[in-house]
Amino acid sequence: VKVYENTQVNSIDYGPQTHICVTENGEIRARQILLCNAAYLTKSGFFSNTAIPVYTYGSITRPLTEDELDSIGSPKPFGVIPAESFGTTLRLTNDKRLLLRNVFSYARGFKSKTSDIEYAKKKHQVAFDRRYPDLAKIGYEHSWGGLLTLAQNGGMVFGKLGERVYGAAFCNGTGVARGTAFGKALAELVVGQNSRSIEILSNRPKPNYGLPNWITEIGVRATTKYRFMKSGLET
């Protein structure tokens, strides 16, 4: 196995015998391709104009001291998700850091700006103040964003896309859990196995064509703002 890290694929030429992935520094040739590249799958020749790209953001503290842990009840590592999906996810990691996640934004061009991360960090600080007012003064050590892909109809990509081309994408907001399940099932499918997961995923609806990007962006921004406000104290 050869792993090419930090190697952007600019285009793919799907051929009858060999597929050619064109990069800045050369070509990678493969008989078979598995596309597991989230929204970028729509730039790889399949399901164009279907992705609703959204960024969600997280912030994490430095490791807490024993006194700081005592001040919040000396909890063991935990993870709490909100009843309202646009509320705040809160975790205490094994290395004693608090991690908060909320804020969604439309990712024009599948990208996020530094100003978007700074805005999210301010919202995370509000959530920190609300939950642990005496501890919140320590702030955050790191803040970041990550891309997730939605479809207007909630559809997902899974299975054979072309001759010796397979794909899995559009986890619709649960990338770790669904991504793991998609990846395992896709590998099984490629080598000719059968499983209940393959059967379920193969019968899920595919992403439908979305509205024009400018309409989608307005809709996503309005919806996320409303849902964030509706979450109330869970944000």
Please identify what each model-predicted range represents.
Residues 3, 44, 135, 139, ...:
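Secondary-structure transition/capping residues
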Residues 1-9:
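A conserved beta-strand/loop element that lines the FAD pocket in flavoprotein oxidoreductases
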Residues 4, 34, 166-168:
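Hydrophobic/aromatic beta-strand patches that form the interior of the parallel beta-sheet core
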Residues 19-23:
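SH3/SH3-like beta-barrel fold
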